[in-house]
A protein has these predicted regions:
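Catalytic-histidine neighborhood of serine endopeptidases
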Residues: 74, 81-124
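Catalytic nucleophile loop of clan PA
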Residues: 78-79, 188-208
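Non-catalytic interaction/regulatory modules that flank or connect domains
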Residues: 256-368
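Signature of long, low-cysteine stretches enriched in small and polar/charged residues
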Residues: 344-405
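C-terminal subregion of chymotrypsin/trypsin-like serine protease catalytic domains
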Residues: 51, 201-267, 428
């Protein structure tokens, strides 16, 4: 990178040695023009002054693997109380929550490394609060409300273990129709900056760095979520142990799936036309929907797809995501294949596994499935419903529903629904409502 910068600098230099500067001869009787200095009030606030004032409030979080005694991952955190409370992301400290026997956390204060205690998490917002033992004199104030759109902001953190940095960007409001509240920040948030603060020009916290899509598209946890978690933590009668922390994660996941279920069940399921069928459309504004029909003249059949999914999820661990709703419809038709060959094609399509919610065997059990033929308002449908349980969080499941219409010999709709992190009752309830959205228009 440094060589590229050097090349860029050299490319801007002159091609020939510069001669003495020249200037046009002044007109007789005309005084030299004097350019007035720019008023100080019109200059932007100096980023280096802000950085110098507050850099001691931001620290690097190190997750230490106990057996090796070395760091396995890093993030950022910032102090928010004189009692040593600091905010960071849940995903930064998730290993400590899920595997406290294998991992611990510490803060690099620059002149010393100090152990921290994990006090509270908000898994849906991706927040956590840690605490150092000694009190701190210098800490951030959390803003009471979101800033106006277009406000100039400053993100801080420790990108790629390069030391504390400050990055300028712009506040662009809450992400519209998001399942989990996020702020759109136009600025660079790089790996290692997760859990760091994003600040107003006065140095107050307006959000917590959480994710990036690259190309100056970053995301923050709203400051209101951070304040709510801090208030709950300060009200704790005693620090929780590891079992209580994990239990709180399960309770939060259970509350989150209930919120999503209530929201979907309270909404009329819209219908989307797909060939001669009507299928579930965009069930809620937090779902993004897309459609496509590949065109290959050599293929003797046509597949038109329509897919909806929640673009956000909940990070549980590096191997496990949850809090997901996604579904896919495929309308298959052929004028070239006979009934027998189309049936074989259709069966192959039905037997393909949809992409499940990311998880490993340590996270979830194997799927257990039940297959049957059902009548949906006169439309015969072959359906298979599969559930797998969460090992660490009893009562939570992933569901996969597969269904295919069977009313025609050379066309049909194959559909799949995937739900991540729901109770068994709520998952089945949503699957039934989903199946009721299938119909034939002829």
């Amino acid at each position: 990178m440094f060589s590229l910068l050097l090349v860029a600098v050299l490319a801007q230099g002159p091609l020939t040695p510069p001669g003495p500067p020249t200037s046009p001869a002044p007109d007789a009787g005309v005084a030299d023009a004097v350019v007035p200095p720019l008023p100080v009030a019109s200059l932007p606030p100096a980023t280096h002054d802000l950085f110098r004032r507050i850099q001691g409030r931001v620290s690097q979080v190190r997750i230490i693997e106990r057996r090796s005694g070395t760091k396995s991952s890093i993030g950022s955190a910032f102090f928010v109380s004189e009692k040593g409370h600091a905010l960071t992301n849940y995903h930064v400290v998730s290993d400590v929550v899920l595997h406290p026997e294998d991992y611990t956390a510490e803060l690099d204060r620059g002149d010393a490394t100090v152990p921290v205690r994990l006090l509270a998490v908000d898994v849906a917002s991706d927040l956590a609060i840690i605490q150092v033992e000694a009190p701190v004199a210098d800490f951030f104030r959390l803003e009471d409300r979101e800033p106006p759109q277009g406000t100039r902001l400053f993100a801080m953190g420790n990108p790629r273990d390069l030391g504390t940095t400050i990055v300028e960007g712009t506040y662009n409001g809450l992400v519209r129709d998001a399942l989990y509240e996020r702020v759109h920040f136009s600025g660079a948030i790089n790996p290692g900056m997760s859990g760091g603060p994003t600040l107003s020009g006065e140095g107050n916290v307006v959000g917590v760095n959480v994710a990036t899509m690259g190309n100056q598209v970053g995301f923050l946890v709203p400051v209101t979520k951070a304040r709510q978690l801090l208030d709950r933590t300060l009200a704790l009668p005693a620090p929780p142990d590891a079992a209580a922390l994990r239990k709180s994660v399960g309770e939060q996941l259970m509350a989150n799936q209930q919120r999503i279920t209530d929201r979907l069940m309270a909404t009329e399921l819209p219908k989307q036309g797909l060939g001669d069928y009507r299928v579930p459309g965009r069930w809620s504004p937090f779902l993004k929907c897309w459609g496509d029909t590949p065109h290959d003249p050599e293929t003797p059949y046509t597949v038109t797809s329509y897919q909806c999914s929640s673009e956000e999820d909940i990070f549980l661990s590096s191997s496990h995501r949850t809090g997901v709703v996604t579904y896919l419809h495929q309308h298959v038709t052929s004028q070239k294949l006979g009934a027998m060959r189309f049936s074989a094609l259709y069966s192959t399509l039905f037997s393909q596994d949809p992409d499940p919610v990311p998880a490993t065997r340590e996270d979830v059990t194997n799927f257990r499935c039940k297959s049957e033929f059902v009548d949906v308002k006169g439309l015969t449908v072959r359906a298979a419903i599969c559930l797998r349980a969460y090992r660490r969080f009893p009562g939570l499941y992933d569901l996969v529903l597969r269904a295919a219409t069977l009313n025609a010999s050379t066309h049909g709709v194959d559909t799949s629904l995937t739900l991540g992190g729901f109770s068994a009752d709520n998952a089945r309830k949503l699957a039934r409502r989903y199946l009721e959205g299938l119909s034939w228009t002829k």
